[in-house]
Every structure is written in structure tokens, then in C-alpha cells.
Amino acid sequence: MELTQAGATLYAYAREILDLHRIAKRAVSDLVELVTGKLTIGASFTVGEYVLPRILAAFTRKYPDVKFSVIIGNTEFVHEHARDSSIDVGLVEGLVDDPQLEVTKFLDDELILIVSKNHPLAGASVSPEELEAKLKDVPFIIREEGSGTRLAVEKALEKLNFKPSNMIVLGSTQAIKESVEANLGVTMLSKWTLRKEIKLGSIKPIRCCNPFKRGFYLIQHKDKFQSRACAEFIRFILEQTLRLF
């Protein structure tokens, strides 16, 4: 059976219509799948300065249409902003106990006891029993109240039964590192903050016991609407962070 001229013409147009329908459907699907929008991220100092930049760089390469606004403070500061929903997601050091928040660990951390390369104990192994005697006259430099690092360090010192007699409080990890390099005192900091200095040899660890482990956590309000961009950012952090470091 052969189509009439009118039928052949109609058939050609019908095929074009079907092809256009498939193209339009694919285009709409691509638009729906496109991840766009703006995220407001809160990060504690350690995470915001030493971990988050690499995550954002990798995420932006994959999702260039997502824009970011990042606020940085200590863990208590980020916790408060997550509670009042003024940020989409927070990244903090130390476990946050709050029934209003979803809390998920995304990276392991370790606290390292460090001194200047010129300190007599640089690179030494010291038993916990010897630690207080050897460091009793050395200022211990620590972060401010409300810092997740400070809380973790206080717990570590308690386990070591080490009570520094002279403590210097500084509100910046970088300031603490500079002070240790200048041989002002001793401190404990996250391993993620010390990669460059240890590689350069300007700061040396003191090995005194088993590693002090902690986690970095992702926090967000349970009742806050989660945009597609936010969902993809969280998924990216949980799936890709370990590969970036």
C-alpha cells in the first residue's frame, strides 16, 4: 500500500513533530537537572580556613551556576546560625548536640601536640607521665571559649592529666601557629591546619600518646527547606571530601 501525496506530506510533518517533541523534552529535562541557586554556608574557623576552600573549588567546577556566601566564626557561632536558620548548612569541628539540628560527620580529624622546631622537645617522644614536668614552665596557647578546637583540646589535656599553669588565649588558629613558630609556647591543633608547617619543618610534633581523634560535622536545621543546590552540596561533601584530601 502506498501513501497518497497528502498522506506522505502529513507523515513527514508528523515525524518532524515527534522529533521536536523529543528535543523539547530533553531540553526541559536538562533545565530541571541544572543545579543553580545561592547557598549561605557557615563554617567554624578550622573547617572554613583549611578544609572548605578545597571543597568549594571542586564543587564549583561541577556546579558552576551555584553561588556561595560563607560566614566564618567559632563552632558556637555557627551553631547559633544553624539554629535560627540564617544559614543553609554549617560545617563545624566537634559534635553538636542539638535536637533541632541534623548532625552528620563528614571528615575525621586528629589533634597534634606541637612546638617550634627550636624547642628542646621538637620531634621527641614523651610519656603522658613526663609531659607536665617537661612543659610546666611553657605557656600553653589555646583558642577562645566557644571554639570547638578549644573544647577538644581541653578534653585531650584532661585525658593526659595535664593542667597547664600558664595559658595564652588567641582567637585565631593562624595566630596560634605563628606564636608557636616564634617559640612562644606549645599548643594542640587539628592536623588539617598543620600540613604546610609540618612539611616545611617550622613546627614539630611531640609524640606523647595515642592520637586524639575527633570529627568534623555538617549541621542544618531539621525544619529548614532544602533547595536542590543545598541537597547537592551536602551530597557532594559526604561523597567527595575524602577524595579531596
Predicted regions and their residues:
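A late-sequence structural motif
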Residues: 51, 204-245
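Short amphipathic alpha-helical coupling segments at ligand-binding clamshell hinges
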Residues: 6-13, 51, 55, 127, ...
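Secondary-structure junction motif
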Residues: 121-125, 139-160, 227-234, 244-245
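Alpha-helical "hinge/linker" immediately C-terminal to small N-terminal DNA-binding modules
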Residues: 2-33, 238-242
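Short beta-strand->loop
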Residues: 102-112, 191, 200-213
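Flexible hinge/capping segments at coil-to-helix
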Residues: 101-111, 115-141, 228
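Central regulatory/effector-binding core of bacterial HTH transcription factors
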Residues: 34-99
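Hydrophobic hinge/microswitch elements
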Residues: 74-79, 83-87, 92-93, 152-205
